[in-house]
C-alpha cells in the first residue's frame, strides 16, 4: 500500500497549534494541504469552511487519483471530504462508524459517513452491530478497535521529570487533565455546562493542579475559550494549552489523577492508562464506556462529588472496550 496524505482543518490553523508540524515531525510526507480559513465558529463560517474542504479535497483527489480514501471519525470536514470522494468515485473506508454521541451533531455526521462508506472499520462489536442495522452488508464491516490506543503501545511516554520539562511547569500533588468541547446540540452549545464545570473546579483545593486544553473548532468554541480565559487568568493552579500534541498529552494523561470534561479521550485512551474519567454532561451520552468512567450531570455539586470519587478509584487493570492497541495492523489487513 502507498500512503497519500491530505491534511486539512484545525491541523493547519495557528490558533489550534499548527499540529501539521507534529505530523511532519513524525516523518510523514504531506501530499496535499487543504486550508479551510476557519475565521470563526459561526455556522455560516463553518459552512464556508466545509465548502472549501469539498472543493480543495476534490482538487487533491483529481491530482492524486487514489484507489481508496481512509477517513476517521465524525468531523464536519471529513463529511465534506467524503462527499468529494463520492463524486470522484473513490471508495471510502471509514473508521469509528456506529459509535454514539447523543449530545453532538457529530452523531448525524458519523451516520452520514457510514452511508457514504464502502468499508466500515468499527471500534467495537456493538458499533459493528449498529452499522449492520443501518443496512450495511456484513462483509463490509470489520471490528478493529480504536487506532488511538495503538499509540499507547508504540510511544515511549515521558516520565514525570521529562514531562515537566516539556510542559515548562511542575505537576502538583494532585492533577486533573481537563477538556471541554462545545455540545453542539444544546441551545447554548454547552456554555452553561462549561461554566458549571469551572464552578466545580473552583470548589477544589488549590493544590489540585488543573491542566486544561482548549476546545475544538465546533460552533460555540469561541464562547468556551472566552469563559476559560476569563476564569483562568492569574491562577497559579491552572495551565492552559492550545494543543499539547500527542506525546505530551498522553504522557500527561498517564500522570494525572483523573481526566475531567467531555472529550472522547477520557473514554478511549484513559482506561488503558488506568486513569479514571469524570465525563460531564451529554456530549458523550450513549458512548460505550469502561468501568473507570464516571458519568455526571453538568452541575457543580455533582462534578465535585464525581471528582472526589475519581480521586479514590483504583483503575489498574480496567478493561478497555475499545480494543488492545493493535488496530493499525487489522486496518491494513482489511484494506
For each feature predicted by the language model, list its residue ranges.
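Conserved nucleotide-sugar phosphate-binding/catalytic loop shared by glycosyltransferases and other
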Residues: 4-49, 56
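A nucleotide-sugar donor-handling region in carbohydrate enzymes
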Residues: 11-17, 117-192
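Active-site and donor-binding regions of nucleotide-sugar-utilizing enzymes
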Residues: 36-138
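A donor-sugar binding/catalytic signature common to diverse glycosyltransferases
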Residues: 71-72, 79-82, 94, 120, ...
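Short hydrophobic signal-anchor/transmembrane segments that target glycosyltransferases
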Residues: 192-207
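Catalytic donor nucleotide-activated moiety binding site of glycosyltransferases and closely related
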Residues: 207-243
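Nucleotide-sugar donor-binding patch of glycosyltransferase catalytic domains
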Residues: 271-317
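C-terminal amphipathic helix plus adjacent low-complexity
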Residues: 305, 309-335
